[in-house]
């Protein structure tokens, strides 16, 4: 198997094909969708596939990926259809609550993320002092959040486990499988929203920033049409991932750790909150670095910023920033980046 593209909320893979593997894939997709729906009441729409010959991939790959995109869009714009069919009786059962059973686990997870530096992925639940372990959707895969203090040297399920190390390797020797990943803003304590208010220029507000890449789909489609090697897509994916995770984390640690929180940064977009003055400065720095890094690509960034008080619901602030981001995308000038703000 080969990962062609994996960034943000999407991925593309090449898998060997036979009838048995297709049957297993269809069953796996149905199982994952059902478990995601039962846990989050949402449908995972990215799990689609098409069958292709090697000759087609080597000569005309674009129609294959276009067909895959059509299938994804079909699921995306008919949300929850299959899941609602399967869960019809459950939805109409008296006394059921819309609250997801995983909400309490996610609350604990979110509260602990700021201090955690490692995530252990295992097929068995790991227990220990001050250790948080969850099994989202109950697929038989556990995610345990660890610190340097409770990081085990060894445990029973080593053969079926992987330790994900974020940003820097631990001091102790790890005897089981591990991999190093970068995650912007991970492993640091968080400030409160009240701490992030900035009163400079007489405006006491917090800045909420949403930013993502423009024209990425067009760039990939152009690469398909030019018959570039499939490995080039994997390279572009890794390049974007490195930018939004490693490079931004380095800048944040150096200049903005005391005034900005990175809620999410990965793939081709980001979501940050902080001092509104420094959020604007950070956005400018990110854009300048992006232009330097991807100068040979026809891609750019658009951003939306909302300025809110500390007690303003963060979800609504994020929606406002996303709306302003959409306005920025409609700026209309070629090779010109757009930032839209909402106050």
Per-segment meaning from a language model:
Residues 1-343:
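Regulatory and interdomain segments flanking nucleotide-handling catalytic cores
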């Amino acid at each position: 198997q080969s990962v062609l593209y994996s960034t943000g909320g999407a991925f593309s893979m090449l898998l060997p094909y036979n009838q048995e593997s297709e049957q297993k894939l269809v069953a796996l997709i149905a199982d994952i969708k059902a478990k995601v729906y039962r846990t989050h009441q949402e449908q995972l729409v990215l799990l689609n596939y098409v069958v292709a010959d090697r000759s087609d991939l080597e000569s005309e790959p674009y129609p294959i990926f276009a067909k895959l995109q059509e299938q994804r869009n079909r699921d995306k714009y008919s949300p929850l259809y299959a899941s609602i069919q399967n869960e019809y009786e459950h939805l109409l059962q008296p006394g059921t609550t819309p609250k997801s059973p995983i909400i309490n686990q996610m609350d604990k997870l979110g509260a602990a993320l700021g201090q955690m530096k490692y995530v252990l992925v295992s097929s068995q639940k790991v227990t220990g002092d001050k250790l948080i372990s969850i099994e989202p959707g109950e697929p038989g895969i556990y995610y345990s959040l660890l610190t340097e203090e409770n990081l085990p040297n060894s445990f029973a399920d080593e053969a079926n486990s992987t330790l994900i190390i974020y940003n820097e390797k631990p001091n102790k020797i790890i005897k089981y499988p591990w991999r190093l990943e970068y995650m912007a803003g991970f492993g640091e304590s968080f400030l409160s929203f009240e701490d992030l208010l900035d009163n400079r220029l007489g405006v006491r507000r917090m800045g909420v920033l949403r930013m993502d890449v423009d024209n990425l789909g067009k760039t990939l489609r152009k690469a398909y049409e030019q018959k570039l090697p499939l490995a080039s897509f994997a390279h572009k994916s890794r390049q974007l991932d490195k930018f939004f995770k490693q490079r931004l984390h380095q800048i944040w640690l150096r200049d903005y750790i005391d005034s900005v929180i990175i809620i999410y940064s990965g793939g081709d977009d980001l979501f940050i909150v902080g001092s509104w003055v420094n959020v604007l400065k950070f956005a400018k720095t990110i854009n300048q670095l992006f232009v330097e890094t991807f100068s040979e690509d026809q891609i750019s960034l658009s951003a939306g910023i909302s300025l809110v008080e500390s007690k303003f619901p963060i979800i609504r602030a994020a929606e406002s920033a996303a709306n302003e981001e959409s306005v920025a995308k409609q700026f209309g000038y070629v090779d010109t980046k757009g930032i839209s703000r909402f106050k």
